[in-house]
Curated annotation (Swiss-Prot):
<protein>
    <recommendedName>
        <fullName>Diaminopimelate epimerase</fullName>
        <ecNumber>5.1.1.7</ecNumber>
    </recommendedName>
</protein>
<feature type="binding site">
    <location>
        <position position="11"/>
    </location>
    <ligand>
        <name>substrate</name>
    </ligand>
</feature>
<dbReference type="GO" id="GO:0009089">
    <property type="term" value="P:lysine biosynthetic process via diaminopimelate"/>
</dbReference>
<dbReference type="GO" id="GO:0005829">
    <property type="term" value="C:cytosol"/>
</dbReference>
<keyword id="KW-0413">Isomerase</keyword>
<keyword id="KW-0457">Lysine biosynthesis</keyword>
<comment type="function">
    <text>Catalyzes the stereoinversion of LL-2,6-diaminopimelate (L,L-DAP) to meso-diaminopimelate (meso-DAP), a precursor of L-lysine.</text>
</comment>
<dbReference type="InterPro" id="IPR018510">
    <property type="entry name" value="DAP_epimerase_AS"/>
</dbReference>
<comment type="pathway">
    <text>Amino-acid biosynthesis; L-lysine biosynthesis via DAP pathway; DL-2,6-diaminopimelate from LL-2,6-diaminopimelate: step 1/1.</text>
</comment>
<feature type="binding site">
    <location>
        <position position="193"/>
    </location>
    <ligand>
        <name>substrate</name>
    </ligand>
</feature>
<feature type="binding site">
    <location>
        <position position="62"/>
    </location>
    <ligand>
        <name>substrate</name>
    </ligand>
</feature>
<feature type="site" description="Could be important to modulate the pK values of the two catalytic cysteine residues">
    <location>
        <position position="162"/>
    </location>
</feature>
<keyword id="KW-0028">Amino-acid biosynthesis</keyword>
<dbReference type="Pfam" id="PF01678">
    <property type="entry name" value="DAP_epimerase"/>
</dbReference>
<feature type="site" description="Could be important to modulate the pK values of the two catalytic cysteine residues">
    <location>
        <position position="211"/>
    </location>
</feature>
<feature type="active site" description="Proton donor">
    <location>
        <position position="71"/>
    </location>
</feature>
<feature type="binding site">
    <location>
        <begin position="72"/>
        <end position="73"/>
    </location>
    <ligand>
        <name>substrate</name>
    </ligand>
</feature>
């Protein structure tokens, strides 16, 4: 299998052109290639496929083999992948995902994509659609307890579920201990991504993420979008902010005129290769 390893702010995936090679059992392949000791090493696997309703289709799998609806960092890399490999000559393209069709605007320098702006669509705030078991709409400050830990979560879906809470010192937070308690909490019928957020000022947010099916990652694009939405709903920031993740910064904007979230950030190719599967 021919592959390209890429990352968006350190959120790394193995990218495969599935328009030119047949990939069977992607769940198993994702578990294999993601292993950082016995595989290539990644947060998961991304397949680029033909689409009947967009320029390309993206399927993505977490490191545990589960299929995810969408990943903001991964979709930026998909844009770079198809442009840099001359699969398209357009700098604005559409990508079909399980979370709907996304529009990508790519900044190109020296015939290579360096920055990608993604129209992430409208945030989903209905509890049953996120989904989260709550009577609130929108779900702001839902008190959830797991073992001895209790937090007020604001819940948002960007095509995948996110639960956001605010703390004082995100750098020192024991995420590996507490993240999974809420990822698998009964309040979330399809599990959830969990974001712990520290407010820096009214246009800067610092966050760490416990990703559903992957654990802590260096960055999560949909998570950054969900965090901005939650922070606007709670009156903490304006509609455009810098979101600081372990792997770097994303610019997130919640556009008032169309209600869409726009995410801008880098995409980087690490290396290419072939592996027996």
């Amino acid at each position: 299998m021919k592959f390209t390893k890429m990352h968006g702010l350190g959120n790394d995936y193995i990218y495969v052109d599935a328009t030119s090679q047949k990939i069977e059992n992607p769940n198993e392949i994702s578990r294999f290639v993601s292993d950082r000791h016995f595989g290539i090493g990644s947060d998961g696997l991304v397949l680029i496929l033909p689409s009947e309703i967009a320029d390309f289709k993206m399927r993505m799998f977490n490191s545990d083999g589960s299929e995810a609806e969408m990943c903001g960092n991964a979709i930026r890399c998909v844009g770079k992948f198809v442009y840099d490999k001359k699969m398209t000559d357009k700098s604005t393209i559409t990508i079909e995902t399980l979370a709907g069709i996304k529009v990508l605007e790519m900044t190109v320098e020296n015939d290579k994509v360096v920055l990608v702006k993604v129209d992430m669509g409208e945030p989903i705030l209905k509890a049953e659609t996120i989904p989260v078991l709550s009577e609130k709409h929108p779900v702001i400050d839902e008190e959830i307890t797991a073992k001895d830990y209790c937090y007020n979560f604001t819940c948002v879906s960007m095509g995948n579920p996110h639960a956001i809470t605010y703390i004082e010192n995100v750098s020192e937070f024991p995420l590996e201990k507490i993240g999974p308690l809420f990822e698998f909490h009964e309040k979330f019928p399809r599990k959830t991504n969990v974001e712990f957020v520290e407010l820096i000022d009214d246009s800067t947010i610092k966050m760490r993420v416990w990703e559903r099916g992957a654990g802590e990652t260096l960055a999560c694009g949909t998570g950054a979008c969900a965090v901005l939405v939650a922070s606007v709903l709670k009156g903490y920031v304006g509609r455009k902010a810098t979101v600081k993740l372990l792997g770097g910064d994303l610019t997130i904007e919640w556009n008032e005129s169309d209600n869409h979230i726009y995410m801008t950030g880098p995409a980087t190719t690490v290396f290419e290769g072939e592996i027996d599967i």
